[in-house]
């Protein structure tokens, strides 16, 4: 009799994705959409990375908790992630903050988002829950993390990575012993502690938590009854488990998915204009830090039915071309030069225009003789003829959002205000 392959732990797990955050450090990019719905990489949205990791790891039961300006996110999930089938015991539920438990309460914190949906998680009939942040870019096999969680008998297993100590103020930071048991956990400390023997770096939480559902369910109910709790995983639940239970760290390097192109584990919190621009521009490198061409670990997303990109005109100074760039479908590069840039679906660049190190979100139009450098163009922006961006910092800052790193964010509202002021 042929031996049966061992059952994957992910078949007994669900992914609960926290996707309600605004991402205020992205400024006007999140005025109309939640951070997980922000575009990334030419085709995808940021949330697609967490969902694709779950899908590729073998998880077929997922829930997405939404709150801030969720319409574009919900529409994206409905269009791009509609292939789950109940008859195959597959589920993907969208859980808006609908005040379904208490008519006066939205989601009060990350833990409360799960608490308010305990009945839905119960209906999945699962043993493990993986809590995921929906706003990070990375590739990871959650099966490996689940296996460690079971082998160590932990109450919670937390995904972690090494970051420079002074960058760790935006993360939960942990101390671990030789067995990777967490002995202390500080949420977003002003002065992060370093790793013993490596004081310049800190061990930071990725916002990925693995629990046995029975344990987490009981913990959530008790937390909901605590008037002093902020009902947040990082502030309340995780520190309590570290003090009173068994919390283990899981190093991202043990489960990150890498191809021959990638030389080190890749994880990005694209939470600022500079970080968002850099992570997208990195994809144009000859050897990108993140390999989106990995067919064994695809990034699933909604794919519009559009024609291929088109390049037209071939005369001196009016040659439609793109060098070291990513150009998505339905783009027309007409007599313009694109260098080290990323164009999302449906962009148009007209004659004699020049783009260098530009991230253009869908349906951007760049009119004739525009000269753009080091900028992010929001969806639907129409760049007027002859506009120059990226060469005069004071002029850029007068009309647009100029970041600390010198990246210029351009929205249509900013362009309209400029046009009114200039008459």
Swiss-Prot record:
Q: How does it assemble?
A: Homotetramer.
Does Nucleotidyltransferase count among this protein's keywords? yes
- Residues holding alpha-D-glucose 1-phosphate: 107, 172, 187-188, 205
Protein family (similarity comment): Belongs to the bacterial/plant glucose-1-phosphate adenylyltransferase family.
EC number(s) reported in the record: 2.7.7.27
What does this protein do, in the record's words?
Involved in the biosynthesis of ADP-glucose, a building block required for the elongation reactions to produce glycogen. Catalyzes the reaction between ATP and alpha-D-glucose 1-phosphate (G1P) to produce pyrophosphate and ADP-Glc.
**What processes does the entry annotate via GO biological process terms?**
glycogen biosynthetic process
Task: Give the pathway listed in the UniProt entry for this protein.
Answer: Glycan biosynthesis; glycogen biosynthesis
Q: Which HAMAP family match?
A: GlgC
List the InterPro entries hit by this protein, alphabetically. Answer: ADP-Glc_PPase (IPR011831), ADP_Glu_pyroP_CS (IPR005836), GlgC_bac (IPR023049), GlmU/GlgC-like_hexapep (IPR056818), NTP_transferase_dom (IPR005835), Nucleotide-diphossugar_trans (IPR029044), Trimer_LpxA-like_sf (IPR011004)
Domain of life, per UniProt, equals Bacteria
What is this protein called in UniProt? Glucose-1-phosphate adenylyltransferase
Task: Give the PANTHER family listed for this entry.
Answer: GLUCOSE-1-PHOSPHATE ADENYLYLTRANSFERASE (PTHR43523:SF2), GLUCOSE-1-PHOSPHATE ADENYLYLTRANSFERASE-RELATED (PTHR43523)
Q: Which reaction does it catalyse?
A: alpha-D-glucose 1-phosphate + ATP + H(+) = ADP-alpha-D-glucose + diphosphate
GO function terms (MF aspect): ATP binding; glucose-1-phosphate adenylyltransferase activity
Which keywords are on file for this protein?
ATP-binding, Carbohydrate metabolism, Glycogen biosynthesis, Glycogen metabolism, Nucleotide-binding, Nucleotidyltransferase, Transferase
